Amino acid sequence: MSNQEAIGLIDSGVGGLTVLKEALKQLPNERLIYLGDTARCPYGPRPAEQVVQFTWEMADFLLKKRIKMLVIACNTATAVALEEIKAALPIPVVGVILPGARAAVKVTKNNKIGVIGTLGTIKSASYEIAIKSKAPTIEVTSLDCPKFVPIVESNQYRSSVAKKIVAETLQALQLKGLDTLILGCTHYPLLRPVIQNVMGSHVTLIDSGAETVGEVSMLLDYFDIAHTPEAPTQPHEFYTTGSAKMFEEIASSWLGIENLKAQQIHLGGNEND
């Protein structure tokens, strides 16, 4: 494990780009390699064993690129695969759930926290467990939002359709008296302005992915593997199992990087199995 090696980020699609965007801000000297499994997205409705298998396939691909740290930038994959992968790999592995839960506990004033995520993340109760382990008296209300990821993956997150779907879905949370809402899926920050508008300015939104980059920074220092500024940095790399063109459009727009190039790869057997 060398300081000059890259940090790898994996996600079920383009959602993890919200984590990568924060990493570009907080860790400007680091080289980043991103892999989004867009062909098999969403992970939320899939059985846990299958999500674990897909997460391993992505991790193995990036390990061949000689990464020094792995960020599982996907809440569903973090919920079911983090502990297994962390125990098996010789490099630091970071998930997105614990940092988000910690931040929410710090921020809430009325002890009423909401969590929105995919069916897989919500069913796992990972956020609720993490929050209650820090503050047992906090009331946690969880809601799965199955239509949010497809909106983002189809590049419709700025559309009127997105506004309608978000408003209809979050209606169930509006009367719960929440003062804090965890965006428990890394796709959701792309919908942040719409979510904030629906929930109201009195509700603080927690971006679990952005919180995770703080932990990555801390681990780089702890293991003394931060990239030394004087060493030349190679370009960031982007891989997707889906359409490279669609990925490039969303990534360029979200990250503000012109001429961003992504490479299509195949994982496992049938890419849509």
UniProtKB/Swiss-Prot annotation:
The keyword Isomerase applies. GO terms for biological process: cell wall organization; peptidoglycan biosynthetic process; regulation of cell shape. Pathway: Cell wall biogenesis; peptidoglycan biosynthesis. Its EC number is 5.1.1.3. One of its GO terms (molecular function) is glutamate racemase activity. Substrate binds at residues 11-12, 43-44, 75-76, 186-187. Keywords: Cell shape, Cell wall biogenesis/degradation, Isomerase, Peptidoglycan synthesis. It is an enzyme of class 5 (isomerase). It comes from the Bacteria. The active site is at 74 (proton donor/acceptor), 185 (proton donor/acceptor). Pfam families: Asp_Glu_race (PF01177). It catalyses: L-glutamate = D-glutamate. Belongs to the aspartate/glutamate racemases family. Homodimer. Provides the (R)-glutamate required for cell wall biosynthesis. This is Glutamate racemase. It comes from Enterococcus faecalis (strain ATCC 700802 / V583).
